[in-house]
């Protein structure tokens, strides 16, 4: 999530961007001084696994699962996308576009570049533009979502700037899959589950979260976040098993919903006056306006999180760390917050730890709750240890003039300029392994 304002102003700690990778095993952070990756394998320790200071003002940094492939955009060149191998410290290729890059999404098949009024679909093996979705409704926030599933490889983006229509696009067959009328208000957040068969949506009003089947577009679940006030939804995130959905906003509360079908019980004749009154009340809902009837059928939060702040941009993730379900929240205040989630009972989640994301030497904060924590906590400082374990990238390798002559340049009609990779290396690529990365060796300026 882009944590900077429209003017490029950073949040606390000079943070410009934060996002979890596709399987929630690492966190990428972009800042005024460069970008970093943190491992999410432990609650007590936030291990910095890489830091790069060669590129300043990093406003987008997206990692492909746990591989070495990373896509980078800088505020100094907001129309240029760099694709790098961060462990080798090499730039694999770059592309320039006709307008500012607002978002980049990756999976093992495709790389999506979102501009305000167009979307570019790249083949991640050679970075060639396969398709361009032109003249999309104005999308200044760069809102879009890409499924991480190889078989259900769908892209979702707003189909209107005035109402909450979702366009679903098949990025493998390069054709429109569906249009979902999700909300009356414009869209604010989108998220696919790991299987690519469910899509969660929220509107700018922020009170109702809906989940649709993909590609059919059938409404599966509807959850009410609240009725007292409208909020700005910051992020939606499914757990990897698709059983839970989290929704964070500009308020201090994160809601976690449980996606389980309601089992209908056979009707029973009421034996008391209270039971009879309840039956009459439920029957009367068929005569109420549809908006009121929907409120009777909307699910409520299974669990909640109380954040120690309000008003900060943030991004949430549901993951499993050390065999325990956790909710993680990265915020523009410069911290990563870790909470425990009880998958059986729900309720209010306990804050376990909060870690600084700016690499400072400040001691990691511990929050001890003996009733809910899985093991004793010990306060430690991890800045020095993380720095010792970080990779130190060498200067990026650049192709010589002789190599440039052997590569065929690629130019898209709307201004995406880049090049092609070698076919022999592409054919040997195995993108299902995290150690692999697309064998692109070109560079364009």
Curated annotation (Swiss-Prot):
<dbReference type="InterPro" id="IPR048720">
    <property type="entry name" value="PROPPIN"/>
</dbReference>
<dbReference type="InterPro" id="IPR001680">
    <property type="entry name" value="WD40_rpt"/>
</dbReference>
<keyword id="KW-0472">Membrane</keyword>
<dbReference type="GO" id="GO:0032991">
    <property type="term" value="C:protein-containing complex"/>
</dbReference>
<dbReference type="GO" id="GO:0000045">
    <property type="term" value="P:autophagosome assembly"/>
</dbReference>
<keyword id="KW-0446">Lipid-binding</keyword>
<dbReference type="GO" id="GO:0005829">
    <property type="term" value="C:cytosol"/>
</dbReference>
<dbReference type="InterPro" id="IPR015943">
    <property type="entry name" value="WD40/YVTN_repeat-like_dom_sf"/>
</dbReference>
<dbReference type="GO" id="GO:0016020">
    <property type="term" value="C:membrane"/>
</dbReference>
<dbReference type="GO" id="GO:0005776">
    <property type="term" value="C:autophagosome"/>
</dbReference>
<dbReference type="GO" id="GO:0061723">
    <property type="term" value="P:glycophagy"/>
</dbReference>
<comment type="function">
    <text>Component of the autophagy machinery that controls the major intracellular degradation process by which cytoplasmic materials are packaged into autophagosomes and delivered to lysosomes for degradation. Involved in an early step of the formation of preautophagosomal structures. Binds and is activated by phosphatidylinositol 3-phosphate (PtdIns3P) forming on membranes of the endoplasmic reticulum upon activation of the upstream ULK1 and PI3 kinases. Mediates ER-isolation membranes contacts by interacting with the ULK1:RB1CC1 complex and PtdIns3P.</text>
</comment>
<dbReference type="Pfam" id="PF21032">
    <property type="entry name" value="PROPPIN"/>
</dbReference>
<protein>
    <recommendedName>
        <fullName>WD repeat domain phosphoinositide-interacting protein 2</fullName>
    </recommendedName>
</protein>
<dbReference type="GO" id="GO:0000407">
    <property type="term" value="C:phagophore assembly site"/>
</dbReference>
<feature type="modified residue" description="Phosphoserine">
    <location>
        <position position="395"/>
    </location>
</feature>
<dbReference type="GO" id="GO:0098792">
    <property type="term" value="P:xenophagy"/>
</dbReference>
<dbReference type="GO" id="GO:0000425">
    <property type="term" value="P:pexophagy"/>
</dbReference>
<dbReference type="GO" id="GO:0009267">
    <property type="term" value="P:cellular response to starvation"/>
</dbReference>
<keyword id="KW-0853">WD repeat</keyword>
<dbReference type="GO" id="GO:0010314">
    <property type="term" value="F:phosphatidylinositol-5-phosphate binding"/>
</dbReference>
<feature type="short sequence motif" description="L/FRRG motif">
    <location>
        <begin position="223"/>
        <end position="226"/>
    </location>
</feature>
<feature type="repeat" description="WD 1">
    <location>
        <begin position="182"/>
        <end position="222"/>
    </location>
</feature>
<comment type="similarity">
    <text>Belongs to the WD repeat PROPPIN family.</text>
</comment>
<dbReference type="GO" id="GO:0034045">
    <property type="term" value="C:phagophore assembly site membrane"/>
</dbReference>
<dbReference type="GO" id="GO:0034497">
    <property type="term" value="P:protein localization to phagophore assembly site"/>
</dbReference>
<dbReference type="GO" id="GO:0005654">
    <property type="term" value="C:nucleoplasm"/>
</dbReference>
<dbReference type="GO" id="GO:0044804">
    <property type="term" value="P:nucleophagy"/>
</dbReference>
<feature type="repeat" description="WD 2">
    <location>
        <begin position="228"/>
        <end position="267"/>
    </location>
</feature>
<dbReference type="GO" id="GO:0032266">
    <property type="term" value="F:phosphatidylinositol-3-phosphate binding"/>
</dbReference>
<dbReference type="InterPro" id="IPR036322">
    <property type="entry name" value="WD40_repeat_dom_sf"/>
</dbReference>
<dbReference type="GO" id="GO:0080025">
    <property type="term" value="F:phosphatidylinositol-3,5-bisphosphate binding"/>
</dbReference>
<keyword id="KW-0677">Repeat</keyword>
<feature type="repeat" description="WD 3">
    <location>
        <begin position="311"/>
        <end position="349"/>
    </location>
</feature>
<keyword id="KW-0597">Phosphoprotein</keyword>
<keyword id="KW-0072">Autophagy</keyword>
<comment type="subunit">
    <text>Interacts with TECPR1. Interacts with ATG16L1. Interacts with ATG5. Interacts with WIPI1. Interacts with WDR45. May interact with NUDC. Interacts with ULK1 and RB1CC1.</text>
</comment>
<dbReference type="GO" id="GO:0030674">
    <property type="term" value="F:protein-macromolecule adaptor activity"/>
</dbReference>
<dbReference type="GO" id="GO:0000422">
    <property type="term" value="P:autophagy of mitochondrion"/>
</dbReference>
């Amino acid at each position: 999530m882009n944590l900077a304002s429209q003017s490029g102003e950073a949040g606390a700690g000079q943070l410009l961007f934060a996002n979890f990778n596709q399987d929630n095993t690492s966190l990428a952070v972009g800042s005024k001084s460069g970008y970093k990756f943190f491992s999410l394998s432990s609650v007590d320790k936030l291990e910095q696994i890489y830091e790069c200071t060669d590129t300043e003002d990093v406003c987008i940094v997206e990692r492909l699962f746990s591989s070495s492939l990373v896509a980078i955009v800088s505020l100094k060149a907001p129309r240029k996308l760099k694709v790098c191998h961060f462990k080798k410290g090499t730039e694999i290729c770059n592309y320039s576009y006709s307008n500012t890059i607002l978002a980049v999404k990756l999976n093992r098949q495709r790389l999506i570049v979102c501009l305000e009024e167009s979307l570019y679909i790249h083949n991640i093996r050679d970075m060639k533009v396969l398709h361009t979705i032109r003249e999309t409704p104005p999308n200044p926030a760069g809102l879009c979502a890409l499924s991480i599933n190889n078989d259900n490889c769908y892209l979702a983006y707003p189909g209107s700037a005035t109402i909450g229509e979702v366009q679903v696009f098949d990025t493998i067959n390069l054709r429109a899959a569906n249009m979902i009328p999700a909300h009356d208000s414009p869209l604010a957040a989108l998220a696919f589950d790991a299987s690519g068969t469910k899509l969660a949506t929220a509107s700018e009003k922020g009170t109702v979260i809906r989940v649709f089947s993909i590609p059919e577009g059938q409404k599966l679940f509807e959850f009410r976040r609240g009725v007292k006030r409208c909020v700005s939804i910051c992020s939606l995130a499914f757990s990897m098993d698709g059983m839970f959905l989290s929704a964070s906003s500009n308020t201090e509360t994160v809601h976690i919903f449980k996606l389980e079908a309601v089992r209908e019980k056979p009707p029973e004749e009421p034996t008391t006056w209270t039971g009879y009154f309840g039956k009459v009340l439920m029957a009367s809902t068929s005569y109420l306006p549809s908006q009121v009837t929907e409120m009777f059928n909307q699910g409520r939060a299974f669990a909640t999180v109380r954040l120690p702040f309000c008003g900060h941009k943030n991004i949430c993730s549901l993951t499993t760390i050390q065999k325990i379900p956790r909710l993680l929240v990265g915020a523009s205040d410069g911290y990563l917050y870790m909470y425990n989630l009880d998958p059986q009972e729900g309720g209010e989640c306990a804050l376990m730890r909060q870690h600084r994301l700016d690499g400072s030497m400040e001691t990691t904060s511990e929050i001890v709750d003996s009733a809910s924590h899985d093991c004793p906590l010990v306060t430690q400082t991890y800045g020095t240890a993380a720095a010792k374990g970080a990779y130190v990238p060498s200067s990026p390798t650049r192709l010589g003039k002789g190599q440039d002559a052997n590569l065929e340049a690629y130019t898209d009609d709307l201004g995406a300029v880049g090049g092609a990779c070698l076919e022999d290396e592409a054919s040997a690529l195995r993108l299902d392994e995290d150690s692999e990365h697309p064998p692109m060796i070109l560079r364009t300026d």
